[in-house]
From Swiss-Prot:
Protein name from the UniProt record: 3-isopropylmalate dehydrogenase
Natural source organism: Pseudomonas putida (strain ATCC 47054 / DSM 6125 / CFBP 8728 / NCIMB 11950 / KT2440)
Residues that, per the record, bind substrate: R96, R106, R134, D224
Source taxonomy: Bacteria, Pseudomonadati, Pseudomonadota, Gammaproteobacteria, Pseudomonadales
Subunit structure: Homodimer.
UniProt enzyme class: oxidoreductase
Keywords for this protein: Amino-acid biosynthesis, Branched-chain amino acid biosynthesis, Cytoplasm, Leucine biosynthesis, Magnesium, Manganese, Metal-binding, NAD, Oxidoreductase
Pathway: Amino-acid biosynthesis; L-leucine biosynthesis; L-leucine from 3-methyl-2-oxobutanoate: step 3/4
Cofactor(s) required, per the database record: Mg(2+); Mn(2+)
Gene Ontology terms for molecular function: 3-isopropylmalate dehydrogenase activity; magnesium ion binding; NAD binding
């Protein structure tokens, strides 16, 4: 029986970059005889326009039945004025929570060909390879109660809640330790245990889980210091594990150490490694339709999908090698362009990766 992959291009540049990723996926499917079948649907603003909601029930059901989901990006100014509960981003939060995608893996890798693209000195970032493991379905983004109320005198007050259960922390900690075990055997847990009760529990549980991983070196760091250390000396980190909000912020910061968020993929996994894969960048509505968006993060998300959800490491490595070969050829989209290289658009970059993959 064939494996089912649901394609959700989303909004903004999503359809453009997804078209290139699908070309690469289809070639890998044929080249490595993977037996995938692809289905397409809508999410985010595109779903609001079609169904009136950011994630239709039938789309969610298709995602549940699929073996993996490949997503582009959601959101845009067109939908900024509608009710908060039905904005495009709510579709993304809903599909993550409903599919139980609690573990978000966000690599920050500096390709040697792009060393000049980083805003930091080459000696600080050269060879950078960090993996941030972010808890994705708990914490302040999902906590209740939340809302607004009116205080005496008519002043408005807004409030959110940051809850974490022991089981939520334990399962994401295990993912962090498992990833560290097959990499550099170093795990840094990031929290704010000097202030937050949820972080105090987080640290206690991570320490307990560490007993099962004596071969992994565990350290703890407050989130404010971690944000500073990522800029000061990022290569001290191998795998970082942290909560939903801290991970959201730190992974975006880490991505810019590499020179372009347009290069970075991500994976969101459930307990069985079934997952949703998407680029780290957003929908970039300011360049949508111009044909200049960088498709490499989405193409590399295909590679992550093959590795983590389908255990197809040979196909994953081939895609990564194809991307590296294209960079060796000096092809660059505008976001990673530097003197001496050739600037190309979205489609030409995708075609180049396809050609490189075909010739491997």
């Amino acid at each position: 029986m064939s494996k089912q992959i649901l394609i959700l291009p989303g909004d903004g540049i999503g359809p453009e970059i997804m078209a290139e990723a699908v070309k690469v996926l289809e070639l890998a499917n044929d080249k490595f005889q993977l037996g995938f079948s692809l289905a397409h649907d809508v999410i985010g603003g595109a779903a609001i326009d079609k169904h009136g909601v950011p994630l239709a029930d039938e789309t969610l059901e298709r995602a549940r039945k699929a073996d993996a989901v490949l997503l582009g990006a959601v959101g845009g100014p067109k939908w900024d004025k509608i009710e908060r509960d039905i904005r495009p981003e709510r579709g993304l939060l809903k599909i993550r929570s409903q599919l139980g995608l609690f573990a978000n893996l966000r690599p920050a890798i500096l390709y040697p060909q792009l060393a000049d693209a980083s805003s930091l000195k080459p000696e600080i970032v050269s060879g950078l390879d960090i993996l941030i493991v972010r808890e994705l379905t708990g914490g302040i983004y999902f906590g209740a109660p939340r809302g607004q109320r009116e205080l005496e005198g008519g002043e408005r007050q807004a409030y959110d809640t940051l809850p974490y259960s022991e089981s939520e922390v334990r399962r994401i900690a295990r993912v962090g330790f498992d990833m560290a075990r097959v990499r550099g055997k170093k795990l840094c847990s990031v929290d704010k245990a000097n202030v937050l009760a949820s972080s105090q529990l987080w640290r206690e549980v991570v320490e307990d889980v560490a007993k099962d991983y004596p071969d992994v070196e565990l350290s703890h760091m407050y989130v404010d210091n971690a944000a500073m250390q990522l800029v000061r000396a990022p290569k001290q980190f191998d795998v970082m594990v942290t909560d939903n909000m801290f991970g959201d912020i730190l992974s975006d910061e880490a991505s810019m150490l590499t020179g372009s968020i347009g290069m970075l993929p991500s994976a969101s996994l459930d307990a069985d490694n079934k997952g949703m894969y998407e680029p780290c960048h957003g929908s970039a509505p300011d360049i949508a339709g111009l044909g200049i968006a960088n498709p490499l993060a989405t193409i590399l998300s295909v590679s992550m999908m093959l590795r983590y959800s389908f255990n197809q490491s040979a196909a994953a490595e081939a895609i990564e090698k194809a991307v590296s070969l294209v960079l060796d050829q000096g092809l660059r989209t505008g976001d990673i362009f530097s003197e001496g290289c050739r600037k190309v658009g979205t489609q030409e970059m995708g075609d180049a990766v396809v050609a490189a993959l075909r010739n491997l």
